[in-house]
A protein has these predicted regions:
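Surface-exposed interaction regions that form or flank ligand-binding interfaces
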Residues: 4-82, 88-95, 100-110, 114-213
Length: 213
């Protein structure tokens, strides 16, 4: 009887041991996946920051002597506020350049409020995320910036563009630019109602003194 009890206890102990081993293995797998995903997220953020810096550097290279360039400009009009990634000002106008460093594939149409961003991680896992339609974002930026300038007595045409660093725009649109050459041509095309030197200096002062915030 004692032997049978001992065998039963040993079997029970082995079962508990195997369960503990299984739990430990599962925990290690979970931690490995979590670490990989966090590492993947950090890499994406790092890539986004590098892309932003690269864009700013490339934008400056297409500017002419009299062009003004500003980055990360905060603008407030009434209860509305926005931040502009890149802003170029010259006699031909005021140009907003919104940079999107989307990886993977983008799905959506012009009328959609949200687009679907889809990509695969290095481990083959599918990631899907809904992002705001940047066309709506840029239209809003155009409105806020033009009204903010008008509040300070400057009537000027503000034009916004979206640059996809990975060239993965879901469709063709006048708001999208695909190369710096295209942008250079746009910002240096003759305007029938150009900004005066006085207006350009006023705009420069408003931005540098943060009076648009």
């Amino acid at each position: 009887m004692a032997k049978r009890t001992a065998v039963f206890c040993w079997t029970l102990t082995m079962d508990v041991y195997e369960i503990l081993i299984l739990i430990l293995v599962l925990a290690l797998v979970f931690l490995a996946i979590l670490f990989y995903e966090r590492s993947d997220t950090r890499q994406i953020k790092k890539a986004g920051k590098k892309a932003e810096q690269s864009v700013q550097k490339d934008l400056k290279q297409i500017l002419l002597k009299d062009d003004l360039y500003f980055s990360n400009v905060n603008v407030v009009y009434g209860k509305q506020k926005t931040e502009l990634d890149n802003l170029i000002v010259n006699k031909n106008g005021i140009f907003i350049v919104e940079v999107k460093n989307y990886s993977g594939e983008i799905y959506g149409i012009r009328e959609d409020r949200k687009w679907l961003k889809q990509r695969f991680s290095g481990g083959g896992k599918l990631y899907q995320k809904h992002v705001d339609n940047p066309i709506g974002q840029v239209k809003r930026q155009e409105f806020i910036l033009s009204r903010a300038f008008k509040k300070h007595g400057i009537s000027a045409w503000v034009t916004g563009y979206i640059y996809f660093t990975n060239h993965n725009a879901p469709f063709a649109d006048d708001y999208f630019i695909d190369s710096y050459r295209e942008l250079k041509q746009i910002i240096h095309s003759r305007n029938d109602d150009p900004l005066t030197k006085k207006q350009i200096l006023q705009i420069k002062a408003l931005i540098e003194k943060k009076k648009l915030q």
